[in-house]
């Protein structure tokens, strides 16, 4: 298939592009490089074994997207592009709504004009809000996300659902991720946060490699086994495989298809710290800090629907997530070259 991947040079996008190329698909990457670096592109080509086309541009540029869809005879779009830092979204809500919501509107408007009706959307478990029961199941009603980031993901889900209702021939997959971590097993591709990492595993990796002094563990008095927050961590390679499978199985299968992509088990902050300590062979310096507003004690996915309908399930453990992250970070302590 001929695939347009928006945000394809970012963390999850780059790993997915490698898997798409390895599976024989033709890939066009559209990225404005606001959260990624151009130097990942030759890595994608080397690991994917095939050349992806790269277009530097913004998803809010509808004319550019229309041109790409026509010129490359695109069959399907995988839509990763968007801003993704929860804390930053609270301080800069308009930017988040403009990029994530308006950007998606421009994208689907271009798709409609070009008669491209297969879309995989990178959604998030944040759309569930605070649920009374765990694990989270796709049939749960969506909640009220705490942040503009989470709200933007939910708004896009609602927009795409309304679009498909009005134009039933569309095939739209809403993939709700839990906590993607890990790196490509080669050690040459991984997460390279700009500035201070917002997520746990890359922060621990930077402590381990000497870029940060200590990890702040927010809250050790939650009603969990060790008092720290529990989340569902999924290896980025499993997540990338999930996109390829969803794209191949759902092409031209009309409807809105919602799937949780998670491991289906919860791991605490200290579980992750201990796994990383084992991977890098040294203790991780950490200290406890007060809980953060809006953080939930524990949640994880029920991913049985993806197993049942897509024949997709995770194959990589928390230890492998830590090992692959350390392999990447120790080989590339400063991330990708500028």
UniProtKB/Swiss-Prot annotation:
The top EC class is isomerase
Q: In which pathway does it act?
A: Carbohydrate metabolism; galactose metabolism
Q: What is its EC number?
A: 5.1.3.2
- Is Isomerase one of the keywords? yes
What are the UniProt keywords, alphabetically? Carbohydrate metabolism, Galactose metabolism, Isomerase, NAD
- What this protein is called in its record is UDP-glucose 4-epimerase
* Co-factor(s): NAD(+)
Organism equals: Salmonella typhimurium (strain LT2 / SGSC1412 / ATCC 700720)
- The superkingdom listed in its UniProt entry is Bacteria
